[in-house]
């Protein structure tokens, strides 16, 4: 997974950098914190930190999808069903958001890893705007994602030990 991201990064740099340059990773960007009546409704971080957080989220989410598909294919013995269920988990965060009343379910959604699968919304503050609540950034999203990785890996380990398939 890491090799794929590294190769995509190299290809993007080779294609874009000669024409536009590398840019400055120290450029400050603005992110919305949640509510306008806060003392500080916006925060400013560098583009380099944003890209680092984006890469970390992307690697963890791809890792979750690959291992979730492996787990589901071991359980159902059917790759087609496993991929359908894994794809449905990708959109379940948005479905819960719209079906349970927009903005009123944030205590539940903040703990679900599928909420943070929309990486740009999570990191830019758009998720804080949608939920009308602060704290939907990188620090809040990394914990459910890491816990999901650990749970999936633990279940895979238990199933593989029981079935002796790995």
What function would you assign to each model-found segment?
Residues 71-75, 142-166:
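Junction motif at the cytosolic side of a transmembrane helix
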Residues 76-112:
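Transmembrane helix segments
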Residues 12, 16-31, 78, 98, ...:
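Transmembrane helix-loop junctions in multipass membrane proteins, especially transporters and channels
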Residues 1, 51, 80-83, 89, ...:
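Long, contiguous hydrophobic alpha-helical segments, chiefly transmembrane helices and signal peptides
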Residues 13, 67, 87, 100, ...:
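Transmembrane alpha-helix boundary/anchor motif
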Residues 104-129:
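Short hydrophobic, aromatic-rich alpha-helical segments embedded in or entering the lipid bilayer
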Residues 1-2, 166:
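Hydrophobic, small-residue-rich membrane helices and short re-entrant helix-turn-helix hairpins
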